[in-house]
């Protein structure tokens, strides 16, 4: 692919422009995504994050000059890529959809893997997302300095540090890298350590790095720039004067500016004075750009009050937009500069906003979230746990939400979940009323997987209680033997000694013969002259049977079965079979065969 000549005057019409490649960072929780970016940008935003997990996308521009100063081996290369723009996508797999948005938005990605732990469920999910989005990626094998015996050299390229290690350490590093290679191969990816890759189009590069010491970071940046320069230059070429398109990361109040929106601009140009279309809680609106504030190079867009006022911004970049009427803009929504067809732009945004990727059910949970991405992510996580969602909306929890949740029939789904969104005062009052507090379970928080864990724990406990109550009502299979020499009374009621051959015998059940005919109703049981309610396989007990005469309905040494109603048989075979041991299952099969001779569908 030949390099295109790029003119530096961005004000000329139809001037080709190589935009900054957008890079997303994905991986398992706590494997070091944010720490890696901290090392690259020389700042720290970890401490203020909920649960130490990034909850909103951030953006960092790393200019090519900074990258070249870190990666000495690139100084003699003719680099046309202006730098790298990193999106710090949330780390936990509960944010699948938001990460997928990042993947679709990004030109390339870094998948972070703790070299000491290897692939985890979220890591595997990350590579699947990137495969689905057709986004090329590099694997950063982080925490290199935690390899036992590793001797660190601050900010050193990997190969230089690697050469200084003893044989035992180098062998351990090789083993850890090839563990990653093997896991990637299991998922259909060919990979190798970056310095051994001859064809980056066919093989994934694995770059061992340490965010703590900076080792390997120059190599990682060099591989990213090399990939973009070699394989993406044509795709990254755009017309400067095209109308800008971006995604709203966050709505923020800024002193002296009022409500502003942080935007990742991924196409075209946005200028002061442009009319833009935005998605708000009141629908698609238009407004005029009052000012543009771009982060200074090497600054994170989440760190406030460090912005440059600019007249225009060219993709790709993180930019703060100040304009009237931004306070109701929905985070995660598209923003477009209006060109020749304003209605087409507004219709396009409206369509995108209504096509939220959420599967709803006639009955299920009600969830509210602060952003579209968070809403989709929460719904996806619930769906993965086979939890239906009845209603999912962006916005605050209202009185109407509480009232609607109370009407849900299934107590397991009579739940209201709020992710990172406030509860309106009248809704708070309603949730405190005893009638609603007893009926509705409310969960809220700013870390999705914590909310999910709390819900699952509550649901499992409630389900256990409900199952226990249900089990108490279900008649379980059992088989008994009438013992010889143990007829204590012939009838009214018959009292005999029996041995439970299998299953659990409870009072109040009907007994049937092996030909299916009724033998009477078990009214009471005694074990060692003590009244009991149930007996188990191997027990020998005395039982009283109403409606039976020994020698007529049954006799000694007869085997009797517990009579199970047809509707109970269906529940036992479809829902409770795992709770039965093999002997009880055999008795159930023996019992159902009696009735399925005439009707094969009995109890099904």
UniProtKB/Swiss-Prot annotation:
One Pfam family matching this protein: GTP_EFTU
Signal sequence range: none
Keyword annotations from UniProtKB, A to Z: GTP-binding, Initiation factor, Nucleotide-binding, Protein biosynthesis
The UniProt record lists the keyword Membrane: no
GO molecular function, one term: GTP binding
Positions of the UniProt region annotated as G3: 88-91
Region feature G2, mapped onto this chain: 52-56
PROSITE patterns: G_TR_2
Top-level lineage group: Archaea
InterPro entries, alphabetized: EFTu-like_2, EFTU-type, P-loop_NTPase, Small_GTP-bd, T_Tr_GTP-bd_dom, TF_aIF-2_arc, TIF_IF2, TIF_IF2_dom3
Binding site for GTP: 27-34, 88-92, 142-145
Glycoprotein found in the keyword field: no
GO-annotated cellular components: cytoplasm
Family affiliation: Belongs to the TRAFAC class translation factor GTPase superfamily. Classic translation factor GTPase family. IF-2 subfamily.
Function of the molecule: Function in general translation initiation by promoting the binding of the formylmethionine-tRNA to ribosomes. Seems to function along with eIF-2.
Record-given protein name: Probable translation initiation factor IF-2
Species name: Methanospirillum hungatei JF-1 (strain ATCC 27890 / DSM 864 / NBRC 100397 / JF-1)
């Amino acid at each position: 692919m030949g390099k295109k000549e790029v003119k530096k005057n961005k004000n000329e019409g139809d001037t080709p422009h190589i935009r900054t490649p957008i890079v997303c960072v994905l991986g398992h929780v706590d494997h070091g995504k944010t720490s890696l970016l901290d090392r690259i940008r020389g700042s720290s935003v970890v401490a203020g994050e909920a649960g130490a997990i990034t909850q909103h996308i951030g953006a960092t521009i790393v200019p090519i000059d900074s990258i070249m100063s870190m990666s000495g081996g690139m100084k003699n290369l003719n680099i046309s890529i202006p730098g790298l723009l990193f999106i710090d996508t949330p780390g936990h797999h509960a944010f699948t959809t938001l990460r997928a948005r990042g993947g679709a938005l990004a030109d390339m990605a870094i998948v972070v893997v703790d070299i000491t732990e290897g692939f985890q469920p979220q890591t595997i999910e990350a590579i699947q997302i990137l495969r689905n989005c057709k986004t090329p990626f590099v694997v950063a094998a982080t925490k290199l300095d935690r390899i036992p015996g590793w001797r660190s050299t601050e900010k050193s390229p990997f190969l230089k540090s690697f050469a200084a290690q003893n044989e035992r350490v180098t062998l351990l590093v090789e083993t850890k890298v090839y563990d990653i290679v093997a896991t990637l191969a299991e998922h259909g990816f060919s990979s190798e350590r970056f310095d051994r890759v001859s064809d980056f189009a066919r093989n994934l590069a694995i770059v061992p790095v340490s965010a703590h010491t900076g080792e390997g970071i120059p190599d990682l940046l060099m591989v990213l720039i090399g990939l973009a320069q070699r394989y993406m230059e044509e795709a990254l070429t755009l017309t400067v004067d095209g109308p800008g398109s971006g995604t709203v990361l966050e709505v923020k109040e800024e002193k002296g500016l009022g409500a502003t929106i942080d935007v990742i601009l991924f196409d075209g140009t946005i200028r002061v004075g442009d009319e833009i279309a935005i998605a708000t809680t009141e629908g698609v609106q238009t407004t005029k750009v009052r000012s543009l504030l771009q982060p200074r190079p090497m600054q994170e867009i989440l760190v406030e009050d460090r912005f440059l006022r600019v007249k225009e911004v060219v993709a790709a970049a993180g930019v703060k937009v100040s304009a009237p009427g931004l306070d109701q803009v929905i985070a995660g929504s598209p923003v477009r500069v209006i060109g020749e067809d304003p209605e087409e732009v507004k219709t396009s945004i409206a369509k995108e906003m209504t096509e939220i990727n959420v599967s709803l059910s006639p009955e299920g949970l009600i969830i509210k979230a602060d952003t579209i991405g968070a809403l989709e992510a929460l719904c996806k996580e619930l769906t993965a746990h086979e939890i239906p969602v009845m209603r999912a909306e962006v916005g605050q929890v209202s009185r109407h939400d509480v009232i609607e949740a109370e009407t849900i029939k299934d107590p397991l789904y009579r739940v209201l979940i709020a992710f990172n969104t406030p509860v309106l005062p009248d809704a708070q009052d309603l949730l405190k009323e005893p009638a609603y507090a007893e009926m509705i379970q409310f969960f809220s928080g700013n870390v999705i997987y914590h909310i999910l864990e709390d819900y699952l724990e509550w649901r499992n406990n409630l389900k256990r209680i409900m199952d226990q109550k249900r089990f108490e009502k279900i008649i379980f299979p059992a088989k008994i033997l009438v013992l010889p020499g143990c007829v204590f009374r012939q009838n009214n009621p018959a009292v005999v000694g029996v041995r439970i051959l299998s299953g659990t015998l409870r009072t109040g059940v009907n007994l049937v013969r092996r030909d299916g005919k009724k033998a009477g109703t078990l009214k009471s049981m005694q074990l060692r002259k003590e009244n009991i309610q149930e007996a188990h396989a191997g027990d020998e007990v005395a039982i009283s049977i109403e409606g039976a005469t020994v020698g007529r309905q049954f006799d000694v040494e007869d085997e009797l079965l517990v009579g199970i109603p047809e509707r109970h048989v269906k529940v036992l075979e479809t829902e409770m079979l795992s709770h039965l041991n093999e002997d009880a299952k055999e008795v159930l099969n023996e019992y159902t065969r009696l009735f399925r001779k005439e009707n094969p569908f009995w109890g099904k």
